[in-house]
Amino acid sequence: MKHPKILSILLLALLISAGISWDQFTHPDISSEGAVSLPEKEIHIPATAETPPAPALQAKYACVMDSISGRTLYGKDMDMKAPMASTTKIMTAILVLESGRIEETVCASSYAASMPKVHLGMQKGYQYHLKDLLYSLMLESHNDSAVAIAEHMSGSVQEFAEQMNQKAAELGMANTHFVTPNGLDAEDHYSTASDMCRLAAYAIQNREFCALIQAKSHHFSTIDGKHNYSVSNKDAFLSYYEGALGIKTGFTGKAGYCFVGAARRNDTTLTSCVLACGWPPNKSYKWTDTKKLMDYGFTNYAPLVMPVQDLTALRIPVEDGKSSFVSCQQPDEIHTISSRSEAITVIYEIPEKLYAPVHADTPVGNISFYINDTLYCKENIFPSESIEKSVFSDTIRNVLHLWMENFG
C-alpha cells in the first residue's frame, strides 16, 4: 500500500495548493454559471374563435383529412367498417403504377370477361396494354378491366387481394380488408371513410396517378388493332369544385353511392370520403356532401408550423465531461393544419444538467405538441455533439477511493 499512500499524499497537496476543496470531489457538482436554459418550458397559444358547426351530411360515413399531416378535420362515424364499391380501384391502380409494369401486355380470361357492368366489354383472349386498362379502370370504372389487371399482376384475384391488403397495412389502413380488385359486393370486403382518406392522400403523391385521374378521355385498341375503345372521365367533381384533383366514384346496391376525393387550394391539400351517401335516385348527394366537407376544411383550417424555441442556443451543463456544456440540435419543423378555434400548447422536457458520456444520437429530452389538450405528436431532443467522460475525473475519483480506504 506504499505507492497508493504516496500518490494520495501528493494528490492532496496538489488540491490544497490549487485551492480545490475536498468537498468538490466527495460531493461533485458543476457550476451553473454559463448555462443557458429555455426562456419558457411551456408555450400556450389560446384559441381565438368558436368551434365551427359540423357540416350536415347525407352520407352515413364521412371524413375530411389534411393530406400532408394526416390530421382528421371532421369525421362522421369515420372508423365504421362499410363496403366502398369502386373506390376500391384506387388501390388497384396504385399497385399497378408502383410495379413499373404498365407497358406489359394483358390477356383477358373468361372470368375477367364475365364481370358485370360497368365493363369494357372484353372477350376471352383479347390482349391489351396494361396502361390502357388503367384508363378503363379509373375513368369509367370497368369491372372486367380490374379483374384482368389483377390476374395479370398476381396470377389470380385472390393473390392480388393479398397484395392489396399488404399495402393497406403499410399505409396504416387498420380497418380495411380487400377481397376484390373492383369493389363489387363481397363478404369481408370493407373499409372506412378515414382509411380511404389515407389511401387517397398516399395516391395523390404519385404523379402518374394524378395524371390518370385527371385525364378527360383516352382512346386505345386491342394489341391486334381489331377492337377500338374510347373512355371518358366520369368524375364530375373535377368541374364541380374549385381546386378539385378528382379521384374515384363508386356504387353498388350494398354500398350505396360513394366518393373519395381530393382538392388543393394554395398550400392546403385535403382528401375526403363519403360512403353510403344515398341510393338511387339520389346520385348527386355524394357531390354536395363532398363540397360541404371540403368547404369545412378550407374555410376553417390553415397550415401551421408548430412553434419551437431555438434549441441551438441552449447550454446544458455536463457533469464529468471533457466539455462543460452542450447545446442541442434544432428539430425538424412540425407541419400540420389547425383552426383558429383550437389552442396550441408546446411543452419542453429538458434536464437541468447531463452526465457524461453524452451521445449525439441519444435523446436528452423531448417536446410535446398538444392541440386542444390532446397530444398531437412528440419529438425527441438530441444533443448537438457527443461529450466523452473526462479521464482526469475518473483518475481523481480512483485516487480518492484509495485515500478513503487507507485514511478515511
Where are these regions (language model features)?
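Generic detector of short alpha-helix boundary/capping microenvironments
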Residues: 6-9, 50, 57-58, 80-81, ...
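Basic side chains
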Residues: 2-5, 76, 89, 167, ...
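Sec-dependent N-terminal signal peptides of Gram-positive bacterial secreted proteins and lipoproteins
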Residues: 3-24
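Domain-terminus/edge residues, biased toward the C-terminal soluble/receptor-binding domains
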Residues: 2, 22, 174, 187-190, ...
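An N-terminal domain-start capping segment
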Residues: 16-18, 26, 89, 399-400
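Active-site-adjacent loops and short helices of periplasmic peptidoglycan-processing enzymes
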Residues: 23-207, 223-224
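N-terminal hydrophobic or amphipathic segments with adjacent small-residue motifs
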Residues: 13, 64, 115, 119, ...
